[in-house]
C-alpha cells in the first residue's frame, strides 16, 4: 500500500500525521510519500518529494497518482495532513476492512473539529459498521488500483481538489464497484488549516468560489452530469 499526503506550510501537522501512522505495525509494510506542495516555510521532517510551486490538492493528487501507477501497490491511501486518530491499528483496520468488503474506494467515517459536521452525511459515523455508499468525500480515501488505472489522471479543471471525489464516484458507479464508509474506523479532521492559520496565498472565499466554479463547469459539460447530481443528492440526503 502506498500512503501519501501533501504539505503546504504546515510541517508540524504533517509530521504529526506520520508519527500517528507509525504506531501501526502495518506501516512497515507500506511505502510513504510526503509531497511538499510549494511550501515557503520550513519543510516537514517526513518530506520525501518536493514541488517548487503550490499545485493545490488536485495537482498534488495527480503527482502522487502518476507515481503510484509506476509501482505495483494494490492500494493508495491519500490522507489530508490535518487528520487526528488514536490507537495503533488505523492502517490495519482500513486495509482489512477494504479487503473484507471488496471496496474499491474506502474511507473511515469523519468527525470534523468544528461546530458543523461534514456537509456530506454519508461520511458521518452512524454506528452501523461497514456501509455501502455511492461516493466518499476525499478527506482520507483508500483507493484500489483498478479504479486509479481507469482514471489515470484527474481532469486538470479540478486542480483545486473539489470534484476529485465526485469524479471517482462517477467511475465506481459506472463500473458497479463497491464504495464503503466504516463506522468502526473514525478520524477527526481539523479542517482547512492552511486557511485558518493563514498559510496560503489565496483567501478562503476566493478559493471556494474558484473551486466550486471549476467543479460545476467541468461536470455540467461532461458525460457525468446526471451522475454528478445524483451523487450530490446522495450525500446531502443520506440517512439510515
Question: Where are the language model's segments positioned?
Answer:
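Short, well-formed alpha-helical segments that are part of the catalytic scaffolds
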Residues: 10-25
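Glycine-rich, basic loop-to-helix element that forms the pyrophosphate-binding segment
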Residues: 52-68
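Short beta-strand-to-loop acidic/aromatic patch adjacent to the donor-nucleotide binding site
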Residues: 73-84
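Conserved donor-nucleotide/metal-binding helix-loop-beta segment in metal-dependent transferases, i.e.
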Residues: 89-105
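Short beta-strand-to-loop element that shapes/binds the nucleotide-sugar donor at the catalytic cleft/hinge
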Residues: 106-120
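Active-site donor/metal-binding and catalytic loop motifs
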Residues: 111, 181-202
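A recurrent flexible, glycine/aromatic-enriched loop bordering the glycosyltransferase active site
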Residues: 125-143, 161
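Donor nucleotide-sugar recognition loop
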Residues: 138, 152-170, 174-181, 185-188
Amino acid at each position: 500500500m502506498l500512503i501519501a499526503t501533501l504539505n503546504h506550510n504546515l510541517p508540524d501537522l504533517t509530521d504529526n500525521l506520520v508519527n500517528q501512522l507509525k504506531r501501526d505495525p502495518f506501516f512497515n509494510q507500506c511505502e510513504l510519500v510526503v509531497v511538499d506542495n510549494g511550501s515557503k516555510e520550513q519543510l516537514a521532517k517526513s518530506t520525501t518529494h518536493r514541488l517548487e510551486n503550490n499545485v493545490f490538492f488536485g495537482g498534488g493528487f495527480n503527482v502522487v497518482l502518476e507515481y503510484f501507477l509506476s509501482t505495483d501497490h494494490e492500494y493508495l491511501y491519500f490522507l489530508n495532513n490535518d487528520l487526528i486518530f488514536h490507537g495503533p491499528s488505523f492502517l490495519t483496520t482500513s486495509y482489512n476492512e477494504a479487503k473484507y468488503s471488496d471496496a474499491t474506494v474506502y474511507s473511515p467515517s469523519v468527525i470534523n473539529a468544528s461546530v458543523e459536521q461534514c456537509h456530506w452525511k454519508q461520511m458521518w459515523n452512524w454506528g452501523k459498521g461497514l456501509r455501502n455508499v455511492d461516493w466518499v468525500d476525499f478527506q482520507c480515501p483508500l483507493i484500489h488500483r483498478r479504479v486509479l488505472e481507469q482514471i489515470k489522471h484527474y481532469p486538470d479543471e479540478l486542480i483545486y481538489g473539489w470534484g476529485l471525489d465526485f469524479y471517482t464516484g462517477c467511475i465506481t458507479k459506472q463500473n458497479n464497484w463497491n464504495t464503503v464508509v466504516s463506522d468502526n474506523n473514525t478520524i477527526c479532521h481539523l479542517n482547512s488549516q492552511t486557511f485558518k492559520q493563514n498559510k496560503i496565498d489565496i483567501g478562503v472565499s476566493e478559493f471556494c468560489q474558484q473551486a466550486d466554479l471549476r467543479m460545476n463547469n467541468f461536470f455540467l459539460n461532461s458525460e457525468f452530469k446526471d451522475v454528478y447530481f445524483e451523487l450530490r443528492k446522495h450525500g446531502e440526503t443520506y440517512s439510515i
